[in-house]
Amino acid sequence: MGYFSPRLIAQLGISLFASATWTVQLTAEENWTRFRGPNGSGVSTESDPAPTTWSATENLKWKATLPGPGSSSPIIVGNKVFVTCWSGYGVDRSDNSDQSNLKRHLICLDRYTGNILWDQTVAADLPEDEYGGMFAEHGYASHTPVSDGKNVYVFFGKSGAIAFDLDGKQLWQTKVGTGLDGRRWGSASSPILHNNILIVTAAAESHAILGLDKETGKEIWRAEAEGLGSTWGTPVLTKNDEGKTQIVLGVPYEFWGLDPETGKLTWYCEAMNSDSYCSSVIEHDGIIFGIEGRGGGSIAVKAGGKKDITQSNVVWRGRNNNRISTPIYYDGRIYFFSSRVANCINAKTGEEIYQERLPASTTTNNPAGGPGGGRRGGGGGRGGQDYGSPILADGKIYFVTRNGDMYVLKATDKLESLAVNRVTSDTEDFSATPAISKGELFVRSNKHLYCISTKN
């Protein structure tokens, strides 16, 4: 049993029932309503053709100026795009302003024109984490919103979880903790929805996962454990053969399966040998895949069962490593990117299919953090890491590096680059994962939100 499991058993409890699993059924839709779209898979369920080439003058439908930076992703709900930002403090490393000026924003834009329809600001609860160190790699707007098509839910760290309707009216605000991250990395896990429950991973704030009533913000359950303090990934959902949904989350050394109705731990599994979990797990046909850095390796686990499922449910273990971005599953293969290297492995066996460096860009632009992968620098932050995750649509993989190189790769068993695009020659930081809807890509930087489309 992993390092945190004894504490978990006491704090979360064990719900005992047998569990075989399959994928949550998803229908094709024109919305992209959470981090990495349908169940966090990063894979579009649409059939619309997606663009392959673009530039500042080709297939760029619109460009909107944002009121501040952020590394959260945009989401799309009908004819509206939502994205979060921050302003007033810590906008860059030369900013000497006071924390009391810190504000977070939820921005709503018209998806067809890029016009800002409304901007709701939320003052920060102080003290906040100081801007600096690794915290400056992603900042104060790292959590991607989530929507049920009726309302939009945001997680603003110590300022709590907040619900707005689609016209920008605030419905409720619930505080989830005021803890400061001892590592000074902050928190980044995005909220997700299950039926009427908003699930918030308040890792730094309270070392807890919370289930909130999405209509009122009232706390339904809270599951606390020290292991959550070093978790930055976003959970996924899976179902068992009885039709019961489980939350699955990667934490240091382990995977956890929890009941979303109660927050109780149903199963756990020894996973990667890493004291932190930065990326998110992904799920396909009841198999949970994880790839971590810091020497953690990779793993596939059949979700379900009860208590410790390490001996019974591990499908394979591998030595592949990843740092920040989350993988994607497609057509029996798993794709992921780390330090400008494209990786593809067999999802059934974990065996490597290819590992090749991405083609060189035609530009040497780097964001202001420093050349060649400095803090908030091009080609990734610490150690040259890119923070955005790949997504897939129309049989093509889209991956955006921090300096704005936008790769389009064919999703096949060999590295086949279709294009390397850019939307700007300016110095901007692209730390967010793109979104896609109706064949249109939405990509945000620390300064702008871009809509890339072949449609008029």
Predicted features by range, described:
Residues 10-21:
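Bacterial N-terminal signal peptides
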Residues 6, 14-15, 28, 305:
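Intrinsic structural disorder/low-complexity segments
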